[in-house]
Regions:
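Perimembrane helix-loop-helix junctions
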Residues: 117-126, 150-179
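Membrane-interface alpha helices of multi-pass inner-membrane proteins
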Residues: 94, 128-147, 152-158
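Membrane-interface helix-loop-helix junctions at transmembrane boundaries of multi-pass membrane enzymes
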Residues: 164-171, 262-286
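Transmembrane-helix signature of polytopic, membrane-embedded enzymes
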Residues: 48-51, 70-90
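Membrane-lumen/periplasm interface segments of multi-pass, membrane-embedded glycan/lipid transferases
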Residues: 185-269
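Specific aromatic-rich, kink-prone transmembrane helix
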Residues: 71, 106-124, 135-138, 325
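Short acidic/glycine- and proline-prone juxtamembrane loop motifs at membrane-interface regions
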Residues: 98-105
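Interfacial juxtamembrane loops and adjacent helix segments
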Residues: 1-56
Length: 368
């Protein structure tokens, strides 16, 4: 039984003792931790126990994610059912109900995708310079939390010119993209100065891995390409929680069948311009490639013929971007009587969340 709920607040620093010193996330910027810090800070200000303050941090993280997700859904317009479905994937809420900065990163990712969908599907929307600046600014913030998703800034090049009010739209977009990439390089160099002495992966070395790829590209580039092509297979991990030891494999088929039906219910409802379909597809594939390359360089032993460390949650943003593209590929519109209502999408997602909660609790208590 934990004594944290009886433990009062203190400024005294103590050593880790027998606990594991696992400070391995300090290369992320502070923005991803604002909700958690705010919740814990309120508990500390009110002189609540450490346990209550700890859970306040988690609750504030969930609230922050829900707010960001609601904004993304609102922005998505005709694609709001798909965005709702993705935003309510249990993995999102599991991450949000912790101190993980992924909740803010994912919420921001969905907002950026929602902005893009609004720009290309809203007939009344006219893209102005301020819209481009906002989009680029959000991508800069995202770089500090989910670096591979910096490639979302490339979607600016795939907004039809007729949707804009800018005389030199593509020139301005290109300048913004270059600026974001320059910041990305700066941020990457800055984070490489962080040295986590107590957290080292045996055999992994970025410089050594790059040398291997350059010296024998015909050996190692296919390894990365293979991982990119197999990325879909990692989506089953969206229902594997904890330390990848709490699986819901027994109910995966009906859950994914429901998601498929909801997706196809939106066929014909969403119509992205052809150039936007091409752009979203290219950017999605590039993000998958950058994720695979990043993990191969940083998480995989030098010379290994398999990319290690890949988890399905890394592709949540890609899923949110790809689903509207899939629906745009089909011309035939689904009859109204065969469509799902917004209420049904939310209700079914809540049922899946409830199943996840029951499964997790039952497994944890069974282990105890």
């Amino acid at each position: 039984k934990s004594s944290l709920f009886e433990e009062g607040q203190t400024t005294k620093q103590v050593k880790f003792g027998k606990e594991t010193d696992y400070r391995a996330t300090n290369s992320y910027w502070f923005i991803g931790y604002i909700p958690q810090a705010l919740g814990f800070g309120i508990g500390k200000f009110l002189n609540l126990s450490v346990g209550v303050s700890y859970y306040l941090g988690r609750i504030f993280n969930v609230i922050a994610y829900c707010i960001l997700a609601l904004i993304a859904i609102k922005l998505s317009g005709k694609a709001k059912q798909l965005m709702t479905m993705v935003a309510m994937f249990p993995m999102n809420l599991v991450l949000a109900a912790s101190y993980n900065q992924d909740s803010v990163a994912l919420g921001l990712t969905y907002i950026i995708i929602g902005l893009f969908l609004k720009d290309v599907t809203d007939d009344e929307k006219v893209v102005k310079i301020k819209d481009l600046l906002l989009y680029a600014f959000l991508c800069v913030i995202l770089v500090t939390m989910k670096l591979p998703y910096v490639l979302l800034v490339g979607l600016l090049l795939f907004i039809p010119k007729k949707k804009t009010q800018c005389k030199n739209y593509y020139l301005i977009s290109l300048a913004l993209i270059i600026s974001v990439f320059v910041f990305t390089i700066f941020w990457y160099v800055l984070t490489q100065q962080v040295r986590i002495e107590n957290f080292k992966l045996e055999g992994a070395d970025v410089k050594g891995q790059i040398s291997s790829i350059i010296s024998k590209p015909h050996w190692y580039l296919p390894v990365i390409l293979k991982e990119m092509l197999l990325s879909v297979s990692h989506l089953n991990q969206l229902y594997t929680f904890g330390w990848l030891d709490l699986s819901m494999s027994e109910v995966l088929i009906p859950i994914y069948a429901l998601y498929t039906l909801i997706t196809f219910s939106n066929i014909g409802k969403i119509k992205l311009p052809k150039v936007s379909v091409v752009g979203a597809s290219l950017v999605s594939f590039a993000i998958v490639g950058l994720i695979s390359l990043t993990l191969y360089l940083t998480w995989t032993p030098v010379g290994n013929f398999e990319v290690l460390g890949v988890q399905g949650r890394y592709y949540l943003g890609v899923v949110a971007l790809c689903l509207p593209v899939i629906c745009s590929l089909f011309k035939q519109r689904v009859p109204d009587e065969q469509k799902f209502s917004d209420h049904f999408v939310v209700q079914s997602s809540l049922i899946i969340l409830s199943l996840t909660l029951l499964q997790t609790i039952s497994v944890l208590y069974a282990a105890v």
